[in-house]
Amino acid sequence: MNAVTDLKHDYLVADIKLADWGRKEIAIAETEMPGLMAIRDEFAASQPLKGARIAGSLHMTIQTAVLIETLKALGADVRWASCNIFSTQDHAAAAIAASGTPVFAFKGESLKEYWDFTHRIFEWADGGTPNMILDDGGDATLLLHLGAKAEQDASVIAKPGSEEETFLFAAIKEKLAKDATFYSRNLDAIKGVTEETTTGVHRLYQMAQRGELRFPAINVNDSVTKSKFDNLYGCRESLVDGIKRATDVMIAGKVAVVAGYGDVGKGSAQALRALSAQVWVTEIDPICALQAAMEGYRVVTMDYAAEHGDIFVTCTGNYHVITHDHMAKMKDQAIVCNIGHFDNEIDIASVEQYQWEEIKPQVDHVIFPDGKKIIILAKGRLVNLGCATGHPSYVMSSSFANQTIAQIELWTEAQKGSSKYPVGVYTLPKHLDEKVARLQLKKLNAQLTVLTDKQAAYIGVSKEGPYKADHYRY
């Protein structure tokens, strides 16, 4: 990729000439994002994000472009990078850059470029800092916290444990050599972070438990209108899109092994079964395993499934779910992919010792010593964004409506000097979840039943909602 940065402008994209194409697709996406556009219309006049300087680290797609322009319409100043080296849609990045928003992203970044670009979202053109983070996977949040630690103790970045850490640690060392207080200065300015995905939320809770988190965080992922829609229905459509575009494989009749049966796994399993695959599920959690079994899926271990499966999909958010030994046992031409966040769900590092043969971008043969080949998609990173274009606009409207509301909530409370959000991890209240659902329903011409006064009194809720207790499981 010969991406070009224009020194007269504050951006780095693959080709700024793609902006017109991107703008046309953004216009179409807006018609499919009713919740997000309704929030833009509702708050545009009051400018609740005025003064917010948002460092955004989230897949730079057409749908994200609509999110960025919503944040700006509500008064925010924004800088953006993608949270994945393969997920950028170059025409989307070009359209946003052409509109005047600093964006640093192109499809097929190196790890060095990735961490350079993540730094760029904290480097405001006026020499100032951001005061909010919008994160997906937690890398932007991690960068500031780890960098601030390294300012005090360089040993924390002395021994990388992975290829990813090698480039991350090198980037931090390079920045500290130029600016010894860069991370702590940025960290002190941040009023809060809103986190998009399961993996990033896990990181936030771990940091909070260790007493390391330095600012309040809203867990957007666990809003019902995010996790039960984006994670399930989004993956149900985008997983197979990625596999099909990458391989043109016939899915009917194949044994498809889905590792993990949370919301992402449920959507993935449904998609594969809808195309008549024989779906097997691996799980550690007996409740999720029982759900899978009751849906008619065969529940097995990966040790057993490895030599039988034709297609493997990891959906766990965990580490080394598919190991070298598993891949060594797989059939010739088995397809291996991931729809969790990071590439370490599959132990990609363990097969880098073998010959790799690129079939096309993000589709590789890994050739084992005995001549067997397996197909790895997107080098173990997100298959739906690496090999396709991610979730459809409609379902991303729910997720990004939650992101926007969460940014407004944290920023406005910080501006008031409120003590509502001390350092910790929070979720949005139920009435806001229901608001997002109401906004989305209009697009589908759905008609909600209205409780009578007697019905509301009988079940002990307000006629206007919320209709469920916080402990209710949808």
Curated annotation (Swiss-Prot):
Its cofactor is NAD(+). The keyword Transcription does not apply. Binds 1 NAD(+) per subunit. GO terms for molecular function: adenosylhomocysteinase activity. It holds the Pfam family AdoHcyase. InterPro entries: Adenosylhomocyst_ase-like_sf (IPR042172), Adenosylhomocysteinase-like (IPR000043), Ado_hCys_hydrolase_NAD-bd (IPR015878), NAD(P)-bd_dom_sf (IPR036291), S-Ado-L-homoCys_hydrolase_CS (IPR020082). Keywords: Cytoplasm, Hydrolase, NAD, One-carbon metabolism. GO terms for biological process: L-homocysteine biosynthetic process; one-carbon metabolic process; S-adenosylmethionine cycle. NAD(+) binds at residues 197-199, 231, 260-265, 283, 318, 339-341, 384. SMART domains: AdoHcyase (SM00996), AdoHcyase_NAD (SM00997). Its EC number is 3.13.2.1. GO terms for cellular component: cytosol. Signal peptide: none annotated. Its main location: cytoplasm. CDD domains: SAHH. It is an enzyme of class 3 (hydrolase). It catalyses: S-adenosyl-L-homocysteine + H2O = L-homocysteine + adenosine. The keyword Hydrolase applies. It is found in: Cytoplasm. Substrate binds at residues 61, 136, 196, 226, 230. SUPFAM superfamilies: Formate/glycerate dehydrogenase catalytic domain-like, NAD(P)-binding Rossmann-fold domains. Pathway: Amino-acid biosynthesis; L-homocysteine biosynthesis; L-homocysteine from S-adenosyl-L-homocysteine: step 1/1. May play a key role in the regulation of the intracellular concentration of adenosylhomocysteine. Belongs to the adenosylhomocysteinase family. This is Adenosylhomocysteinase. The lineage of its organism: Bacteria, Pseudomonadati, Pseudomonadota, Betaproteobacteria, Burkholderiales. The gene is ahcY.
